[in-house]
Amino acid sequence: MTPFLPDRSIAKRFDAAADRYEHHAWAQRHAAEALAERIAALALPAKPRILEIGCGTGLLTRALARRLGPADWTLSDIAPDMLRQARANLNLPARYLRMDGEHPAGLDGQYDLICSSLAVQWFGDLNAGLARLTRWLRPGGHLAIATLAQESFKEWHQAHAVLSLRAATPEYPPVADIRAGLLPGRVDSEQHVQSHHSGLAFLRGLKGIGATAPRAGHQPLNTAQLRAVLRQFDRQGACVTYQFAYGQWRKPRGVFVTGTDTGVGKTLVSALLTRAWQADYWKPLQTGLAEESGDSATVAALARLPPERLHAPAYALQAPLAPWAAASLENTCIDATRLTLPETAAPLVVEGAGGLYVPIDERSLIIDLIDNLGLPVVLAARSGLGTINHTLLSLEALRARKLPVLGVIMSGPPSDDNRRAIEHFGRIPVLAQIPQLDVVDAQAVDLWSKQLPTLDSLLSSNASR
């Protein structure tokens, strides 16, 4: 597969700067060391699989290698001469990959850590690019980045504004707006002030690191305008602020429980998995509260969950309807793109609403939420007549979106024929057949949860498929 390389002008600028990059990269060195300190505090496994986006000449790589020790490295950059320079600078066994990190391709599996220092600010859509990177994280894996935020180069912008001009430097987002899909995490920031001999020295420094690509739509200044800006910048003190934003996100170890339809046993399956794995539970979209106490209360009772392992729904609605319809009755607007997974060190079981094509809002279905959350699926299905068709259709829909499925759990009178057909044509294991239970209570959940495979075994099997 040929990596997606959308803006070759950016790559050319960094290629031209590769040999002299580290002579000018004082701010970049500071950010790399600060990010490496944050990464070193994460709970990473021994010899972690690491993917670095925009490795440049290896500043972050070296800072991490000193702190983490042996690792399985994949170092990527959009600029081939930067990769050449990194090879020369690093004494590490690593895979070097020319790739645009905003649209990753050519990768060989998932990673314990995906990291990047002062490269992702070149993404055309920062948050969308970060969300794509999270798909390459292993369950429990971390995404850690340093990027530029809104206050960066404010003195340079001020020197232009005084003259009613606009700077060519790109516009960076506020710290609060930086997100990595729907993963839980945090972004902190610091302001780093760098002094220069003059405005001309500042521009030469930017050229020295290849950071001269202008923002979209910029009209170049004429010579007189540029000289006036440089004089104003010098009068201001020839200092420039870098606002570094450090983002850290973790992909939970867990599953998304969805069903072939409504009323197929998703809540029982969720309770069984929560009990078996000592997991946290989250039902992000709860409807039907006018008629019952809700699935969160049911799972808490069945799985004997303490309050701290039960996460409140993001939306709790009264009508027993699909979330979109129920929300409209209450004049509530659901925004599925703003849902964020709970932050927890425990395994996490997320239960959906109805089947895959249940509407959440005017733009999103449950299958879109699964895609955005990035958790593998456990599919709840009936055991009886009609389940083969419903289950295979659901599996086909998930595969069409390249969404990982760990297995199917069937509920109702056991049918070996239906189980065999689903495993054969669906090419997926049936993890359990839960019979029709006379009494559904915590004791029954205790008993049947012991029949389920461990989360680690399911994740390992999925990785090998």
UniProtKB/Swiss-Prot annotation:
InterPro entries: DTB_synth_BioD, Methyltransf_25, P-loop_NTPase, SAM-dependent_MTases_sf. Pfam families: AAA_26, Methyltransf_25. It is found in: Cytoplasm. Signal peptide: none annotated. Its cofactor is Mg(2+). Residues 255-465 are annotated as: DTB synthetase. Pathway: Cofactor biosynthesis; biotin biosynthesis; biotin from 7,8-diaminononanoate: step 1/2; Cofactor biosynthesis; biotin biosynthesis. It catalyses: (7R,8S)-7,8-diammoniononanoate + CO2 + ATP = (4R,5S)-dethiobiotin + ADP + phosphate + 3 H(+); malonyl-[ACP] + S-adenosyl-L-methionine = malonyl-[ACP] methyl ester + S-adenosyl-L-homocysteine. It comes from the Bacteria. This is Biotin biosynthesis bifunctional protein BioCD. It comes from Bordetella avium (strain 197N). The lineage of its organism: Bacteria, Pseudomonadati, Pseudomonadota, Betaproteobacteria, Burkholderiales.
